[in-house]
Swiss-Prot record:
One GO location term (cellular component): plasma membrane
Protein name (Swiss-Prot/TrEMBL): Foldase protein PrsA 1
GO biological process entries: protein folding
Organism classification: Bacteria, Bacillati, Bacillota, Bacilli, Lactobacillales
Record-stated family: Belongs to the PrsA family.
Superkingdom classification of source: Bacteria
Keywords, ordered alphabetically: Cell membrane, Isomerase, Lipoprotein, Membrane, Palmitate, Rotamase, Signal
Organism: Lactiplantibacillus plantarum (strain ATCC BAA-793 / NCIMB 8826 / WCFS1)
Gene that this sequence comes from: prsA1
Length: 298
């Protein structure tokens, strides 16, 4: 898989050349470097070619799917990441060589690519049924995290006497070591089966609970011992009621599948009327323009 595809779905590289010519981009005691010299040097490198590939794909994606991706969507994703990293957000951007502007460009490119995936990949009934097996709707729980099993046993003994939400909240404030949630009674943001923040043990235990139920034994995770109480579990219901969610999960999985992405990008570029004017770069997209294959999630 070409690195540029991975970069597009991960860290977007930005690169601009303003009419390559005699304009000086740098000067030294040994002479000056012109735009044309810089261009000639860059186009022979793998990174230079990757950037051009990205620029071409972005142009075609923007034309085909630009109207489907709004500034509001980009801003929403940006704010989600900003909230996730909190005060360290600016540092994280800087460490990855990104600014607010370039990060938003990255997010927009990912959203455009996802629209292409949704357009080019056919989701079969078989794929929906397969995704349904692991599907769980969004649930809301509260938890109590402690470091020692003895403490967990003490909490469980208290819950045997009173398993109400009010008492669980009281116990979370008293015993939980999760400083982020304890003051809110250990309440966590809603999550479904695609969540990667919690361990598989935690998720498995949580999804088994009905409203008002709690884990009668502590769940051992890498964080410690956790007691989970279900606040809201709508139940899995029928597959036909969750088709939209299932498709979304499949498309999200496709965004991490290099084979699917390569097929999608190939189709996008073939329909983009791409013409490479520089003979030295004429084969830059050959691996994508010379083959054809069907894309489907099955």
């Amino acid at each position: 898989m070409k690195k540029w595809l991975i970069a597009l779905a991960g860290v977007l590289l930005t690169f601009t050349l303003a009419g390559c010519g005699s304009k000086t981009v740098a000067s030294t005691s040994g002479g000056k470097i012109t735009e044309s010299q810089y261009y000639s040097s860059m186009k022979g490198t793998s990174s230079g070619k990757q950037v051009l590939q990205q620029m071409i794909l972005n142009k075609v994606l923007e034309k085909d799917y630009g109207s489907k991706v709004s500034t509001k969507q980009v801003t929403k994703q940006y704010n989600t990441y900003k909230s996730q990293y909190g005060s360290s957000f600016s540092t994280v951007l800087s460490q990855n060589g990104l600014t607010t502007k370039t990060f938003k460009e990255q997010l927009r490119s990912n959203l455009l690519l996802k629209e292409a995936v949704k357009d080019k990949v056919k989701i079969t009934d078989k794929a929906l049924k397969k995704q349904w097996k692991s599907y769980e709707p969004k649930v809301t729980v509260q938890h109590i995290l402690v470091a020692k099993s003895a403490t967990a046993d003490k909490v469980l003994d208290a819950l045997k006497k009173d398993s109400s939400q009010a008492n669980f909240t009281k116990l979370a404030k008293k015993y939980s070591t999760d400083t982020t949630t304890k003051n809110d009674g250990g309440k966590l943001s809603a999550f479904d089966n695609t969540n990667t923040s919690y361990s598989s043990k935690f998720l498995t235990a949580a999804f088994k609970l009905k409203n008002g139920e709690y884990t009668t034994s502590a769940v051992k995770t890498s964080n410690g011992y956790e007691i989970i109480r279900m606040i809201k579990n709508p139940g899995k219901g029928k597959m036909s009621d969750h088709t939209a969610d299932l498709k979304k999960q499949i498309w999200d999985n496709d965004m991490s599948d290099s084979t699917v992405l390569q097929n999608v990008v190939s189709k996008v570029l073939k329909g983009g009327n791409v013409s490479i004017k520089d003979n030295d770069l004429k084969d830059i997209l050959s691996s994508y323009l010379s083959t054809s294959s069907s894309s489907s999630s099955n």
